């Protein structure tokens, strides 16, 4: 079984209880055989333990189609995802999210916190979730109730 999981924070970056709950849930799920765990958070910091899951930064998922060459994508996405992953996600944008401000790659910036514009960030997170839901292969989606 494949589960696509969404959270808002992940250790060691704890802002409330959600990160701790996400860690326990993913750690327990990872003990199941043949259960890959892609776990989406708005902004990874790079020091999260990914030994039992794959963290996907919502800030690296394109939501607006931008025509960029391979080398540019490789340089900008280094350490986040491969150019092939980027193009696969970009080619699975099914809705017009051009109302959302994006960077040159069509990705949305996230604070990685609980900012004053939290509702806007949640709306942008929905756009990322839509792209991932169309692009990735999974059997079930897990998301906390307020996401």
Region spans (language model):
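Short beta-strand segments
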Residues: 7, 39-41, 142
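Extreme N-terminal starter segment of soluble prokaryotic enzymes
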Residues: 1-3
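Short amphipathic alpha-helix
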Residues: 19-30
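Short His-centered aromatic/hydrophobic patch
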Residues: 122, 143-147
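A conserved catalytic-core segment of Leloir-type glycosyltransferases
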Residues: 34-133
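A short, glycine/small-residue-rich beta-strand->loop->alpha-helix junction that serves as a flexible
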Residues: 9-21, 47-50, 118-120
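Glycine-rich phosphate-binding loop signature in dinucleotide/nucleotide-binding domains
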Residues: 134-138
